[in-house]
Amino acid sequence: MIDLGVSKIALIGAVALIVIGPEKLPRVARTVGTLLGKAQRYVADVKQEVNRSMELDELKKMKDTVEGAARDVETSIQTSASDFEKSWSDATGSDASTATDELPGMVVFPEYKHPKKNWRLKTGATPQWYKARSGVRTKAQSGAARVARFRPQSGRSSSF
């Protein structure tokens, strides 16, 4: 930046005192200070933006290289899998799709479907012994019905 020493700053202050005058000098100094602060913040923001764009460019290049490597790995896996399938079909002497159909031990199991947010599936999957042990109500009953059920019977005498 500009090389300002103590002597140059003193010279600038003396000239400003003579030109502007002692009454307006504090107001002008405040204005100059705020403008310099805004300029410094603007320069810092520009630096941050340039650094951010450089980092984004570097990240994009890294992303491209990683994607290229992933594509290479995928193609190599596909070629090796196709070579294996070809050698397997040559060794067994039949097509791979018919070989799986002919095997008697191959049983197709149903696919598990997670209940996600379905409350009925979640509660239905809980065992009854766990519900009984943890005190889960299995039969809904209104408050009035519950009071009537557990109210002591008046008028009936119990025989001992």
From Swiss-Prot:
Residues 70-100, 133-160 are annotated as: Disordered. The keyword Ribonucleoprotein does not apply. The keyword Transmembrane applies. Pfam families: TatA_B_E. Signal peptide: none annotated. One of its GO terms (biological process) is protein transport by the Tat complex. The chain crosses the membrane at residues 1-21. It comes from the Bacteria. It is found in: Cell inner membrane. It is a single-pass membrane protein. GO terms for cellular component: TAT protein transport complex. InterPro entries: TatA/B/E (IPR003369), TatB (IPR018448). One of its GO terms (molecular function) is protein transmembrane transporter activity. Keywords: Cell inner membrane, Cell membrane, Membrane, Protein transport, Translocation, Transmembrane, Transmembrane helix, Transport. Part of the twin-arginine translocation (Tat) system that transports large folded proteins containing a characteristic twin-arginine motif in their signal peptide across membranes. Together with TatC, TatB is part of a receptor directly interacting with Tat signal peptides. TatB may form an oligomeric binding site that transiently accommodates folded Tat precursor proteins before their translocation. PANTHER family: SEC-INDEPENDENT PROTEIN TRANSLOCASE PROTEIN TATA, CHLOROPLASTIC. Belongs to the TatB family. The Tat system comprises two distinct complexes: a TatABC complex, containing multiple copies of TatA, TatB and TatC subunits, and a separate TatA complex, containing only TatA subunits. Substrates initially bind to the TatABC complex, which probably triggers association of the separate TatA complex to form the active translocon. NCBIfam families: tatB (TIGR01410). This is Sec-independent protein translocase protein TatB. The lineage of its organism: Bacteria, Pseudomonadati, Pseudomonadota, Betaproteobacteria, Burkholderiales. The gene is tatB.
